[in-house]
Amino acid sequence: MEINIIAVGKIKTGYIDEGIAEFLKRLQPYTKVNINEIADEKVPTNPSKAEQEIVKKKEGERILASLTERTYVIALDVKGKPMTSTGLAKSIKNLQIQGNSSITFIIGGALGLGKEVLNKADFRLSMSHMTFTHQMARLIILEQVYRAFKIIHGEPYHL
């Protein structure tokens, strides 16, 4: 199983970078993880709905261009389906059983994901009813993927 993360924007905070590096290291025995950073668009101050849609469309085009053909796409979306850590582990295990060798998590930019990306997703996952920065979302999803693999392997999870 290969885990891909497509994320809009760069990590600009050292402690988040350190956390990401730690979970990438912890995931090595379980799965290969690829992170693809997509350039973010500059968001105007107080953007109109039309300007917001333009930003999401441009970022979405870059996201869609970087998707591989044979991957199960999970879009992180505040309006998506919430899932427990155990539920995520079961979903990953079921995808493996069904023959999926690749899962791609997509993390949008400051304005979220455009409809083209959401429509391409096989599943929309909500990590919380709260909104996180794309930087925090990247760290949190890596932690949850690590936790899922520990659950799948019947191993205790302790930080």
Feature roles, as predicted:
Residues 1-27:
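N-terminal beta1-alpha1 ligand-phosphate binding loop
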Residues 5, 74, 108, 141:
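Conserved RecA-like P-loop NTPase ATPase core
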Residues 6, 34-36:
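General small-molecule cofactor/ligand-binding pocket signal
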Residues 11, 78-81, 109-111:
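Short glycine-rich anion-binding loops that position phosphate/pyrophosphate groups of nucleotides
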Residues 31, 70-71, 121:
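Short, well-ordered alpha-helix to beta-strand connector turns
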Residues 39-101:
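S-adenosyl-L-methionine/SAH cofactor-binding core of RNA-modifying enzymes
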Residues 97-106, 128-134:
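Short, acidic/small-residue loops that bind anionic groups at enzyme active sites
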Residues 115-159:
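Structured adenosyl-cofactor binding patch, chiefly the S-adenosyl-L-methionine
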